[in-house]
């Protein structure tokens, strides 16, 4: 059985082949996460202060607890967790699913995504701007890609856990969950009109999604 390390190599290799690399003006630009100033990203850390830890992250090695309301957990390895990714235009994440768990419809506004199934069976798909659903059942070892900015999802269709590794062509892809974003931010009347719901129905749904501060 292929090792976890082998799976990581496969996903990273796929990403490097697919992505268009940006031209850098220095060897590295480790993100200075302590600097509040941002110009389309993080400023560079003093090169004399760079350490191996800036390029290292072990958070994808373990299965995350999936006892959430949707039955899925995303563990990200982006520039905020791995400062050495700054300006490199790539990142990864691991998604773990409980039996029948769902990674709800969401978008990544700044990146395309490619996933590699570590374990389990998934039903995954995305929706085009023309409203067409592109979806497929996946098994262990399968690969699927989601174009930048399009609504997509993954659902575990088995009665056993599932896991995937995902790679992105951005060091900070961003994630916007549709339901949480809409019902956590928009006014009641906008939601009621858009979804043809009664105001009391909107209020009931909004109780689950606290607005962002």
Swiss-Prot record:
One matching Pfam family: Cupin_1
Keyword Metal-binding among record annotations: yes
Glycosylation sites per record: 67
Function description: May play a role in plant defense. Probably has no oxalate oxidase activity even if the active site is conserved.
Coiled coil: none
Assembly behavior: Oligomer (believed to be a pentamer but probably hexamer).
Signal peptide per UniProt: 1-22
Designated name of the protein: Probable germin-like protein subfamily 2 member 5
InterPro entries from the UniProt entry: Cupin_1 (IPR006045), Germin (IPR001929), Germin_Mn-BS (IPR019780), RmlC-like_jellyroll (IPR014710), RmlC_Cupin_sf (IPR011051)
Domain Cupin type-1 span(s) in chain numbering: 58-203
Cellular component GO terms held in the UniProt record: apoplast
Keyword terms: Apoplast, Disulfide bond, Glycoprotein, Manganese, Metal-binding, Secreted, Signal
